[in-house]
Amino acid sequence: REAAAGSKATEEPGASDPAPAVGQPSAEERPSASAKTGCQPALRLRPARLTPLAYVANRVGAGDVPGLQVGSPFDYEEQMKLYVAGKMPDPRDTGYKDALIHWIEHFVRLTHGKAFVLFTNFKLMQEVAERMQPFFDELGLACFVQGTGMPRSTMLEEFKLDRDSVLFGTDSFWQGVDVPGDALSNVIITRLPFAVPDHPLIEARLEDIEAKGGNSFGDFSLPEAILKFRQGVGRLIRTQTDKGIVVVLDNRVLNKRYGQAFLEALPKCPVEVV
């Protein structure tokens, strides 16, 4: 079956408080430093405390300024399709990398390259790229990997020129990158982009929120990850004629309480769980 991203979650009975119901994640949910099936049942999740627009406004000190949210000029229901891997092993499991490579290969074949593969872990990206090189050689695809000596701007231009190539990138390729046209038809997100909680600045921010009686996960970690997720997905459709797929290889969007918030943050489009 197919479902649509961007649909509203079901409110819990009697939920009058706009605070998120996600709460603090369990230990296994916290971000770590280090063939077709049916869609999963809808998750129950109260509305997030802030919309993405309101969250950003508060972050820049403009929370009291009236906002205007303008509709997109793009027809995402026709231009974009979202795939979600429904059965991915935990990243700590020995079979995780094999499963990750399997799905990357599957979807890269589908579009014959023309793909961004976005990672949150630099070491994992390098290892996966190295293991997949024979696959790229077999298909005759160039693979550009961030951090291998080529400047970021040069790598991006080479990717645009070679219409059958793949680019593996981390943080800086999730945003501020514009590849209109058919050079990019596939964005693969390997993991939801939660910030590493032990970074000094992030840690200080989380501690400050908790000290003020807030929920560091619901008030900061989750909305920040959703914003970055939206930015990553946004690499795909840059003009009214662009078409392509987004692939999410992190089944937390299906089986964690907060996962529905990521799907709701996307434009309405067809979704298929694989």
Model regions and ranges:
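ASCE RecA-like P-loop NTPase motor cores
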Residues: R1-P20, P25-E28, A33-V274
